[in-house]
């Protein structure tokens, strides 16, 4: 589990693409502390497992499903990526519950500056927007942000200067694609309140005859 508080901005060092998967090598420093092979690191909000460690970074596998559902396929060598290690049991919960399982991709439709804040308008599919609520939490490229407004085709967030400086948002432009993960709490609530499908009766005449009735 993650919190959406980015620890470091890393750089894509290499991308080895296969037919249905890829291996990312990321140049990093802070997230290497106490990290072992097999640990999880969120890369632009996507939970990846460390397969190799180097003095200046790490390598991780990216599977077919992740490439299809996320914006990782658009990364190139030199791309800046937000990094966060999995939250330790004794760590501070600074953001919100982030699983690292991206729901889909959004597109930056507009960027505007307002005093010290920068506003981002993100367009997304209706399947994602159904879980986006005003004043609720959403993860954009691994960054925990608060939804300021929701529209039929997207939503807006406001970012403070600290967030801009500590993440890769300052390198984002209109038209860029970003990874989106909605608040998992809403998904669980929806699942719990959905009526269950009626169970089929498996008792048949043949079964009764076999049992001696």
Question: What is each stretch, according to the model?
Answer:
Residues 1-213:
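Conserved loop->alpha-helix
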């Amino acid at each position: 589990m993650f919190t959406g508080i980015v620890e470091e901005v890393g750089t894509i060092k290499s991308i080895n693409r296969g037919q249905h998967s890829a291996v990312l090598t990321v140049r990093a420093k802070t997230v290497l502390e106490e990290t072992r092979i097999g640990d999880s690191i969120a890369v632009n909000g996507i939970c990846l497992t460390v397969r190799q460690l180097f003095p200046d970074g790490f390598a991780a596998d990216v599977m077919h499903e992740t490439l299809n559902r996320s914006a990782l396929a658009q990364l190139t060598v030199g791309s800046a990526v937000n990094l966060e290690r999995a939250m330790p049991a004794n760590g501070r919960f600074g953001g919100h519950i982030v699983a690292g399982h991206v729901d889909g991709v959004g597109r930056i439709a507009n960027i505007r500056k307002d005093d010290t804040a920068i506003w981002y308008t993100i367009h997304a599919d209706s399947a994602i927007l159904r879980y986006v609520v005003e004043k609720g939490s959403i993860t954009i490229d691994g960054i925990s942000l608060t939804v300021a407004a929701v529209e039929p085709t997207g939503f807006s967030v406001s970012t403070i200067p600290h967030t801009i400086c500590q993440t890769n948002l300052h390198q984002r432009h209109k038209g860029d694609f970003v990874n989106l993960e909605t608040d998992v709490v809403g998904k669980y609530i929806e699942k719990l309140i959905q009526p269950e499908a009626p169970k089929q009766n498996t008792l048949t005449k043949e079964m009764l005859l076999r049992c001696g009735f």
